Amino acid sequence: MSPSHGSVTLDPLDPAPRSGTPEFAALSARERVLLAAMECVGQWGVTKTTMDDVARVAGCGRATVYRLFPDGKPELFRSAAQANIGRVLLQLGEQLRSAETLDALVVSGVHAAATLSAESPALQYLLDHEPHVAAPHLSFHRLEVLLATARAVLSPLARQFVDPVTADRVVELGARVVVTYTFLPDPGIDLCDRATAQRIARRHILEPLARSLDSSRPSTVPSLDQPTT
């Protein structure tokens, strides 16, 4: 694998509609409640946010929130987090379609995902003030939900360069790298810095993958730098 394969220029992702805007008002009640929950977490965290707070920001009644999420706060915040992850991954996937090599796809994906995590008010509030709330997201079940969503959205892009099984592996490794450095930060490693993201992505994802593929039969090994035919 050559040292450099270019990069993908990513535009800022469209922010989620904010409460009080026409775009927000045009959404369904469920969509407003999910977005309102994320807004509340970004301001007050999970512990201090009540269902009444979410209802007020969403512009609906408390009864509506409970009708949509009868199991209360745990169900609401779990659903809000999953919806937010799905929204961000879909937008990220659209922008990564311009990647011409696996290197560009992985490096740009890791860098962008880390940057988005750092810019999320809700996630940063939890990491700074309620780490005990953020910690369960590292559990096997919660992490698998995130990984499954990432594979569903991003693996088709990686399949341009490698076989489907390897594509899933690449996406999962990338997601794990971002999750690890987001929830267990290393003061010396900032994935929001593109050069650092490139170094980490190549060290922990691309180089091990290249070694694995090199150990396979030559006739079955696709190039990491060219689309598969």
Question: Where in the sequence are the language-model features?
Answer:
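Short hydrophobic/aromatic patch on the recognition helix
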Residues: 59-69
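Amphipathic alpha-helical packing segments from all-alpha helical-bundle domains
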Residues: 89, 125, 133-172
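Helical hydrophobic small-molecule/effector-binding pocket
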Residues: 94, 103-128
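Basic, helix-initiating cap at the start of DNA-binding domains
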Residues: 1-44, 51-57
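Residues that mark the N-terminal boundary/hinge immediately upstream of a DNA-recognition element
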Residues: 50-51, 72
